[in-house]
Structure formats: C-alpha cells, structure tokens
C-alpha cells in the first residue's frame, strides 16, 4: 500500500480538495481501493465525503494517541472503493502539540497492520500547521505531496518542509513525491518567478499539471462528491485527473487499460 501525505503550512492551498479528488479519481478511474484519512481537526475531508463527525467520534487522533485496536473507525463512503478514517473533535486539542516530542508510530503501525492488506493507496490529509499531528503523518507516510498556491507566503513555506522532514529523520529528496500548484491562472505574469523559486528549493519536484481556478471545485464539495463525478466537463475535473495520472505514473501504479480509457 502506498501512503501519501498531502500537506501545506498555511490554509487555502487546495490541500483537502486535492486529497479528496485525487483519492476518488484513483478509485473511479484507475480501479484502486483507496483509504482517505482525515487528520485535520477542521474535518473538511470528512465533510466533503458526506461523513458527519460526532463529538464522540473516534478518528485518527485516537490511533495516534492510543494503542487500542481501532479497526472499527474505518467508515465506508458513498463512493465505490473509497473508505474513510474520519477526523475526531479531540484532535483539535492536539493541533499544536509539542513538535519536539517523539512520534508514537501508532499511526504507521495501524496503517501497516490493519490497512495495507486491504487497500492499494492511503491518502492522509494533514492540518495546515507544524504540530504533532502533522509529524505523525510524516512518519507514517511513504511519500509527501506539498500543496501550494502561486503566492509568496505559500511558496516560502517550502523551506519549512525541509526543516520538518529533518526533524523526523526522512531524506527530503526521497520523501517528497511532488509539489502541486492550485489556483493557477495562466495569465499571471509572475508564474515563471514562482516556478523558478520552487525549482531552486526542490529541483524537478513540481508536478507538470497545474490546477486552474474553477468554481466547480467548491460547488462539488457542497454536493459532497468529487468534481469529476459532479462536473465531469469542468477544467478542475480535467486538471485533477491529469494530476492523478501523473502521481500514479511516478509511483509506478499499474491500472487496467479500461480505466485509463475512461479519462478521455
């Protein structure tokens, strides 16, 4: 099972939207069994899949901070071949947990023992912060996808990733799968400047597919579904499907020819 961590260190980068839509695309178009894991206390990934998070809901927080058998927290969604580990309200209390504490490894162990035999891919949606929960996700993940926007503070956040990876003992060049840019506008005169900055920090890590601005993304979230399912002819559906294939190709994920033909 591939475990991908979608992260950003500021809000509004499209991180959760990409987590949800790439995960759903991997199931719908590539025929994979996907587990989406919501580690963000805002619970937007859970909400975007139509999951109602109760005040006593067990979720990823419980895996990270206990060692109990929590197989029962995995929920089915209305999307075929997509399951969810929902967020927990308790995780809000630990959002800025001491970053210097040692990781528990509970999340990594849980995914390896209980999930890996049944899923092809796990996608973890992290908080937009440098707290303990994000650290746990970095330890558990095989690869990291950094989600950015073509804006100064978002781009400069890449430097924090380097420091953060060092803190969990993972080689940055091996651990970073790619960098995804959302809210892209082809007419923006500063595009090349931002691309050059990204390349200077992480050479050859920027995905070739950029996610253009499209109101269809927010509208699909309100409908609790993927943009490819609700607005299949939209720019966003086209872009995220291309990004999904780009990710799959980098990971050497095999899929049936019938599924690849459905992308056209």
From Swiss-Prot:
ATP binds at residues 9-16. One of its GO terms (molecular function) is ATP binding. Changing residue 90 to S: In plasmid pCHL1. It holds the Pfam family AAA_31. Keywords: ATP-binding, Nucleotide-binding, Plasmid. InterPro entries: AAA_dom, DNA_Partitioning_ATPase, P-loop_NTPase. The sequence shown is that of plasmid pLGV440. Required for growth within mammalian cells. Belongs to the ParA family. PANTHER family: P-LOOP CONTAINING NUCLEOSIDE TRIPHOSPHATE HYDROLASE (PTHR13696), PARA FAMILY PROTEIN CT_582 (PTHR13696:SF52). This is Virulence plasmid ParA family protein pGP5-D. It comes from Chlamydia trachomatis. The lineage of its organism: Bacteria, Pseudomonadati, Chlamydiota, Chlamydiia, Chlamydiales.
């Amino acid at each position: 099972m591939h475990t991908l961590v979608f992260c950003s260190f500021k809000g509004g980068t499209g991180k959760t939207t990409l987590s949800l839509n790439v995960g759903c695309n991997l199931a719908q178009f590539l025929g994979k069994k996907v587990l989406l894991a919501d580690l963000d206390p805002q619970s937007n990934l859970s909400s975007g899949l139509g999951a109602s998070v109760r005040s006593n809901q067990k979720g990823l927080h419980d895996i990270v901070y206990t060692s109990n058998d929590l197989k029962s927290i995995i929920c089915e969604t209305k999307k075929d071949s997509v399951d969810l580990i929902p967020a927990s309200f308790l995780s809000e209390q630990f959002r800025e947990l001491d970053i210097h504490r040692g990781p528990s490894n509970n999340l990594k162990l849980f995914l390896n023992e209980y999930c890996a035999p049944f899923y092809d891919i796990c996608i973890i949606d992290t908080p937009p912060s440098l707290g303990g929960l994000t650290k746990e996700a970095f330890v558990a993940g095989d690869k990291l996808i950094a989600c950015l926007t073509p804006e100064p503070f978002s781009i400069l956040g890449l430097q924090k990733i380097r420091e953060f990876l060092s803190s969990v003992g993972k080689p940055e060049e091996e651990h970073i799968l790619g960098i995804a840019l959302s809210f892209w506008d082809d007419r923006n005169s500063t595009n090349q400047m931002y691309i050059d900055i990204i390349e200077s920090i992480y050479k050859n890590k920027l995905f070739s597919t950029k996610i253009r601005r499209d109101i269809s993304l927010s509208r699909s979230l309100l409908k609790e579904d993927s943009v490819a399912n609700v607005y299949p002819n939209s720019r966003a559906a086209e872009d995220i499907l291309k990004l999904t294939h780009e990710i799959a190709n980098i990971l050497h994920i095999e899929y049936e020819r019938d599924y690849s033909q459905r992308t056209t």
